[in-house]
Amino acid sequence: MLRLSESEHWNINAHFQDFPDEDHFSIPHLATYAGMKFFYSFYKFEEMIDYYHPTYSDRSDIVERIRTHYQLISEKMGYEVKPMQSYINTWAYGLSHFERPDLAIQLFDYNIELYPHHSSVYNAKGYFLLNTGKEQEALKLFYQSLSIKEEEGIRKVIEEIELSRN
């Protein structure tokens, strides 16, 4: 008898996992979870940790690596998948805490490139610049944000900046 795995036509992307301590009633959720983890193993962006580690301080290709990763995801899924705004902002703020403002700025700019019609991407970069003492650049971004969506909180931030400058 020929085993499927020995067939010349074997090209099925499959994985077998035994659950010896489970029974008919406990296995469905565990097996479904394991299957989803297997089929979407390509989704996780594990390379991000490289940029937080001091030995990788010379790395500056963060946007290109993220772009390449999400192109791979898009190809596998069959439609365009973009990183969420919140992910990019979280990575950017994380990098700023690790004293990598150069990379943080790249990520904020990438977020603006991906989501140019979302006010929140301008706010995120604006707050970052404000916290690094670049008030004039921050003001431009806050005004850009308001041109997309009026927000009372951002209007107050602008007023405070302008009052402090006088």
Language-model segment annotations:
Residues 116, 149-150:
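Short coil turns that delineate tetratricopeptide repeat
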Residues 2-63, 78:
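C-terminal catalytic histidine-bearing segment of alpha/beta-hydrolase fold enzymes
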Residues 85, 101, 119-120, 152-153:
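Helix-start (N-cap) detector for alpha-helical repeat units in TPR-like alpha-solenoids
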Residues 89-90, 120-124, 155-158:
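Alpha-solenoid helical repeat scaffolds
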